[in-house]
Amino acid sequence: TVGVIAMILASVKPKEKLILQRNSHRSAIAGLVLGQIEPIFIQSNFNSELGIFTGITPDDLLKCIMKNPDAKAVLLTSPNYYGMATDLDGLIKVARDHKLTVLVDEAHGVHFHFNPYLPKSAVDLRADMVVQSIHKTLPSFTQTSILHLNEDKIEKERIQTLLAYLQTSSPSYLFMMSIDAVRSYMAIKGKEIIDREIEIANFARAEIKKFKYIKSFNKNDIIGKDGVFDFDPTKLTITTKYAGYSGFEVESILNSKFNIEIELSDMNNILCFITAGSSTEDIKKLTSALTYFDENKKIMDNEFEIELPNIPPLKMLPTLTFSKTPELIPFSESAGAISYDVICPYPPGIPLL
């Protein structure tokens, strides 16, 4: 969160424009508020079958830049929570051609650098600044993250000053040791660890393929569609809607009936992470529990098609909104009003409103 805010404040001055995906993390909204910055949102592509926002394409970005030639920077999010990665190389080239500073929220991709079977890391693709949440996919303490700088373009001193303003002046040495320990761990054993994770994930997909109604997509099912350029196979998305269950229902039943805790649920899916701590025994326990849903198919009570609204026009800078005195009104009466704050389900931490 602090890394995203610092990237934004280091790249864009008050009242200047930042191009960003509409499915950016809520920390990006905080950066807009603190920096008095005008957002130019790009609607991400959407996989309607899964009900998942994916990402943007180089062509999407180019069209936006053509309409906003005075934008100063672009904030890209790749991969998304589900491991779907955009064409970062192409996006970076488009941004560079138009002299935009390239910021990447790679919160879920810190492990990409360590294995050739994963998408390319934004760090290796030389984005100007990249923030990664180490704790999301690697064995480090919660809150541990890292901000990478391309020092050919970014003043390190300015970032250091911003970080001093934004975060604690008494950092935890336990957290810092955790970062260094996992860095060493991955430098020595990273490829081997991720090879094993991918093997376990593939085993899980093979087991799920035996079901009639419970499904799990693989690389070939999604690459080249809806803006997806590459995929992290260690993210195991299990689609439950064909069995008549929402992901929310499945998460609740897995927890209460089978003592299984998953990462995330949505209307159509549940999401599991395969990490260094995962085992084939974990997968066997999970797939055994999923048998319950496959064998007890039902008609989903609230099945519906999502109709995506257009991004509404910006009536007021987020900074000005935040400076107003809010009024609490019923949701049913809120059409046409300006939202004072974000409404943000977590995970994944993407503002709904």
Roles of regions detected by a PLM:
Residues T1-Y213, F217:
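Conserved PLP-enzyme active-site core in the AAT-like
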Residues F203-L353:
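Conserved C-terminal alpha-helix-loop-beta "cap" of PLP-dependent enzymes
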